[in-house]
């Protein structure tokens, strides 16, 4: 645990030191769980968006984009269930005065049980080697069965209690499991209470006539209320999807773990509209498609797993999370939900407008069912950043910190580095910079030794460092250094554009999906 905490502290400090993420309003002592993306952070964030957008829109003929407003009519949130049901069950520790989500405390307890089960599996793998039959072991080993049955019983009881709003039983479960404050070890808990997560605001010049509004807690509803506009103007038949990237806001009472859980965050969502009765088929398809999208990033298949929901949201008939192994354990990265026709039918009732689709193949009108994929952009940023940040000891005993991001996502694609500013090297380097800047995001740097400049570029994830020296002036070749291997090669200046493009083009990621 201490090692994981050290890794996480390194992630947070590196993100600030190298211009990726700053605490918001820092000169005024900041705001809890709100962050600003710096010069390198915004480039990485935009590249992640571009990868998602291309995979959703560019590679799928039947998915189109949308950018809906943050402010929407307040009745939308009544229809969606957010006014009445968008709550978190919170519990306070009387000794530490810290507040926690009761459901997360219980889920973390179950995650430890799963860790114990995995340790039993790993021990058996080492013992039996290539002859190990994992499926048989998992289905017969008493310890694994005990750990997993206990998890199932606990999560099922919690889901039932939350569905029935039986908060007393949620507290009783915490006490029966002897769950303690993870920071202090105290088991002295208050009662569990529900807190609504929506931010309220006002629309109007005069306070007495102002309309109550909400900052949207999710981007999905903007898609639902526009679905018929998009369908008619795009002339798409079902199944088709609408994708959107946008800000959402939640008054998280318990906001921790850096950018993993924030009050202002960004979502990348796609709502896929399908004929009733086909939703579970498309749900399974999108589960696999979304996992493949993540795996193409090269962060390791062992760092992902599906978590199928025992407790379903009020709108869903099936739901699963793609979880990622963060420094603080496996946590949700993306959700895939079969939302049925809950949202569109609710908006029909509350608006009085028909939202039915006429299906020419079935020769009937119906309210479509919806399959949703929703990934937290900030969480994906954290997954990439924490996994790719490495400290390496080199053959000569020296050390370096490198951010080994997928080249297509790297904030800066190449650094242009004149060995010295004098003797025409600076001017030649500027010429290369000005020639390539139309195709790639570059950085020009001529201060400090070349070794120090290499280290700075390693730390922000730049795939290539291009050094201009005395020989460049006569033979028009440069030294190009590769980030991950640190190998150097001499190449013609005329080849640079193609070399960089071959490495950083989004085609390299998209073709792996």
Pin down the residues of each PLM region.
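NTP/phosphate- and nucleic-acid-binding module
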Residues: 1-513
